[in-house]
Design a protein with these regions (language model features):
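Extended beta-strand/beta-hairpin segments
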Residues: 1-47, 55-132
Length: 132
């Protein structure tokens, strides 16, 4: 998987982010010098976790023949500060008709989403500069 970010204008921090054939606008709030034309990068991290969790649950439920219409995943992301680790508060709002065993199984499945696993695991960075 590959993603690229390129600045769109000379005002603010608005960037067009490309992933495959998809484009998303990412920016910073006006209070941080941006133009607030899109989510900021940290919000995109929360978006990635919320959407990955929802899709993982829905894929599993579909294979099982379970109806999860109305499923909603809310993620609140608190960046690390001195002495406090990064925190993700993830709330899975599931349809009331699901049984207790189904809900417990879906909670286990939710933690298996690729973004969740990436955030839980070790991450290595290979950083370099290329002159253009």
């Amino acid at each position: 998987m590959k993603a690229s970010a390129q600045r769109v204008t000379n005002d603010g921090f608005k960037h067009t982010v490309t992933a495959g054939r998809h484009k998303v606008t990412v920016d910073e709030p006006e209070g941080n010098g941006g133009t607030d034309r899109g989510p900021n990068p940290q919000e995109m991290l929360a978006v990635s976790l919320a959407s990955c969790t929802a899709i993982t649950i829905e894929m599993y439920a579909k294979r099982k023949g379970w109806n999860v219409a109305g499923l909603r995943i809310d993620v609140e992301y608190t960046p690390a500060e001195r002495g406090c680790p990064t925190k993700f508060d993830l709330v899975m709002k599931m349809p009331a008709h699901l049984g207790e065993e189904q809900i417990e199984r879906l909670k286990v499945i939710a933690a298996k989403c690729p973004v969740h696993r990436t955030l839980e695991g070790e991450v290595a960075f290979d950083e370099r500069v290329e002159l253009v």
